[in-house]
Swiss-Prot record:
Its EC number is 2.7.8.13. One of its GO terms (biological process) is cell wall organization. GO terms for cellular component: plasma membrane. This is Phospho-N-acetylmuramoyl-pentapeptide-transferase. It is found in: Cell membrane. Catalyzes the initial step of the lipid cycle reactions in the biosynthesis of the cell wall peptidoglycan: transfers peptidoglycan precursor phospho-MurNAc-pentapeptide from UDP-MurNAc-pentapeptide onto the lipid carrier undecaprenyl phosphate, yielding undecaprenyl-pyrophosphoryl-MurNAc-pentapeptide, known as lipid I.
Length: 335
C-alpha cells in the first residue's frame, strides 16, 4: 500500500510539473488574467493579469495519478471522492469563466453558487450512506463516541461541506497560501485513510479504503508541484477552479472516512479565515466598525506590515499543526 501511496504523490507531482509550463502560456494567450481588488493591499495590484484558472494543471495530475495508482480505480470510494473534487471544481470553473472570459466581475451570483454547492453536498452525503454504508452518525473527535443524527445528518454535514469548500476559496488570497495549506491537510488524510485501511479506525471500512490514501497522496503531489508556479511571485493562480476543487477533495475524504468533525480541526486555518470574514461583515453592518484591517485574516497581517511570504509561512505552519492535531484526534478514537 505504501508503495502505491508514494508513487501516487510522485506521479501527480511529475504530471503537474510537466503541465505547468505547457498550460501557463496557453492561459496567458487566452487572456485568462486575474482581476485584483482595488481595495486590497496595494502591492497586489502588480499581480493584475497573472493567468488564473491554473487549478486545471494540478487537477489533471491528481486525477490521472489517483486512477493509475488505485487498487481499483472504479471503486465507489474513488469515484465519489474524485466526483466531489471535480464537481466543486466545475462550479469554480464556471465562476472563473464568467469573471475572466465574459468579464462579469462577480462571476456566478451567490445564490447560484450556493445552490450548486448544497446539491453536491447532499449528493455526497446521501451517496456515502446509501451505497457505502457510512451511516448518519458523527464521530466525536478524540473519542470513539458516535453521535447518531438520523436525517439531521444531511443538512448538518452539508453545512460543514459548503462552509469548508468556501473557506478554502477564501484562503486562496496570497501566492502559495491555499496550495500549501491544503498540502498539509492532505498529508493528514494520507495518514487517516491509511490507518482506516489497515486498522479500521472504529468505523465501517469497505474494500479499497486504501485508495482514499492514494487519492490524498496524489493531491499532496499535485499541490506540491503547483507551488513551483504559484509560490511568490506567482506565475499562475489556481482560481476558483482550483480552490473549490481542493475544498471538494477535502470534504469528500472527510465524509468517506467519517471524519466530518475532525475536518474542522485539520482545516483549522480555513475555519479561522472564514470566521474572520463573518465577524468582519457582522461588525461592520451592526456597528460600522471593522475588527480586522481587512478580511480574510491573511490580509489583516499583510496590512499590519508582514510581507506576503511571512504570512504564507506562518499559515503553512498553522496548517501543519492543525493537521497533526487532527490525526491525533482520529487516533485517539481508535483505542
Amino acid at each position: 500500500m505504501w508503495e502505491r501511496i508514494f508513487l501516487a504523490a510522485a506521479l501527480a507531482l511529475m504530471i503537474t510539473l510537466i503541465l505547468g509550463p505547457l498550460m501557463i502560456p496557453v492561459l496567458r494567450v487566452m487572456k485568462f488574467g486575474q482581476t485584483i481588488r482595488e481595495e486590497g493591499p496595494k502591492r497586489h495590484l502588480a499581480k493584475a493579469g497573472t493567468p488564473t484558472m491554473g487549478g486545471i494543471i494540478f487537477l489533471v495530475g491528481i486525477v490521472v495519478s489517483a486512477l493509475i495508482m488505485a487498487e481499483k480505480p472504479t471503486s465507489l470510494e474513488m469515484v465519489m471522492v474524485i466526483s466531489a473534487m471535480l464537481g466543486y471544481g466545475l462550479i469554480g470553473f464556471i465562476d472563473d469563466f464568467i469573471k475572466v472570459v465574459l468579464h462579469r466581475s462577480l462571476g456566478l451570483r451567490a445564490y447560484q453558487k450556493l445552490i450548486g454547492q448544497i446539491a453536491l453536498a447532499l449528493l455526497l452525503t446521501w451517496g456515502a450512506n446509501r451505497y457505502l454504508g457510512r451511516g448518519t452518525d458523527l464521530v466525536i473527535p478524540f473519542t470513539s463516541i458516535h453521535l447518531e443524527l438520523g436525517l439531521f445528518y444531511y443538512p448538518f454535514v452539508s453545512f460543514i461541506i459548503v462552509g469548508i469548500t468556501n473557506a478554502v476559496n477564501l484562503t486562496d488570497g496570497l501566492d502559495g497560501l491555499a496550495a500549501g495549506t491544503t498540502l498539509f491537510s492532505m498529508l493528514s488524510y494520507v495518514s487517516i485513510a491509511t490507518l482506516a485501511a489497515s486498522q479500521g479506525g472504529g468505523v465501517a471500512i469497505l474494500a479499497y479504503e486504501s485508495d482514499l490514501a492514494v487519492f490524498a497522496a496524489a493531491a499532496v503531489g499535485g499541490c506540491f508541484g503547483f507551488l513551483r508556479f504559484n509560490k511568490n511571485p506567482a506565475r499562475v493562480f489556481m482560481g476558483d477552479t482550483g480552490s473549490l476543487a481542493l475544498g471538494g477533495a477535502l470534504v469528500g475524504l472527510a465524509v468517506l472516512t467519517k471524519t466530518e468533525l475532525i475536518l474542522l480541526i485539520i482545516g483549522g486555518v480555513y475555519v479561522v479565515e472564514a470566521i474572520s470574514v463573518i465577524l468582519q461583515v457582522f461588525s461592520y453592518q451592526t456597528t460600522g466598525k471593522r475588527i480586522f484591517r481587512m478580511s480574510p485574516l491573511h490580509h489583516h497581517f499583510e496590512l499590519g506590515g508582514w510581507n506576503e511570504w511571512k504570512v504564507v509561512m506562518v499559515f503553512w505552519l498553522a496548517s501543519l499543526l492543525c493537521g497533526v492535531l487532527g490525526v491525533i484526534a482520529y487516533m485517539a478514537g481508535m483505542f
